[in-house]
Amino acid sequence: MNDLRVEVAVGDRMLEQWRYVHNVIVPPDELSADEVRERSGRNRLENVYLGDELVGCSTVRPPGAEDGVATVIARVLPEYRGRGIGAALYEHCLAHARGLGARHIQTVVLAANGDGVRFAEARGFVEVERYVAPEDENEVWLTLRLGA
């Protein structure tokens, strides 16, 4: 997959691309442009391209000072899944999180996203928490930790 490219989302155009992918994959947690800009100040947001085509995005939340837990989230648009893009993106994000000094890695997945849950479990993530979003009692989220 030589034409796969991961770029840090900087500037309005790239942040809007990141927001598009996020909102397609996580519609219950749709983000505004302002929310994405705020997140970009505290997390590493990246876009993934296959050639010139936007195919996914990622988030790496830096490890907490006390617990050393970093959060890695890889998102691939449905029409591009099953091609190894998610695996390559995940490995890229994992390396970045470890480079930040993460002692533990976790991910967060909407429980209704069966593809995302299976992807995480296939890579050794284990569910450690299940919670309901405060604004929508039908929105169940999973926190999964690598090698928990």
Description of each model-found segment:
Residues G82-A95, G99, R118-A122:
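Conserved acetyl-CoA-binding loop-helix of GNAT-fold acetyltransferases
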Residues I73-R81, V109-L110:
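A short, internal acetyl-CoA/4′-phosphopantetheine-binding micro-motif in the GNAT/acyltransferase core
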Residues V36-G41:
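Short loop/turn motifs at secondary-structure junctions and domain boundaries
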Residues M1-A33, V140-A148:
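Short amphipathic alpha-helix that is part of the acyltransferase structural core
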Residues Q106-L110, E121-T143:
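Conserved catalytic-core motifs of GNAT/GCN5-like acyltransferases
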Residues A97-A111:
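Conserved GNAT acetyl-CoA-binding A-motif
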Residues R42, E66-G68, N113, E135-N138:
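Short acidic/glycine-enriched loop/turn segments that link adjacent beta-strands
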Residues N47, E53-P62, G68-R75:
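Conserved beta-strand in the GNAT
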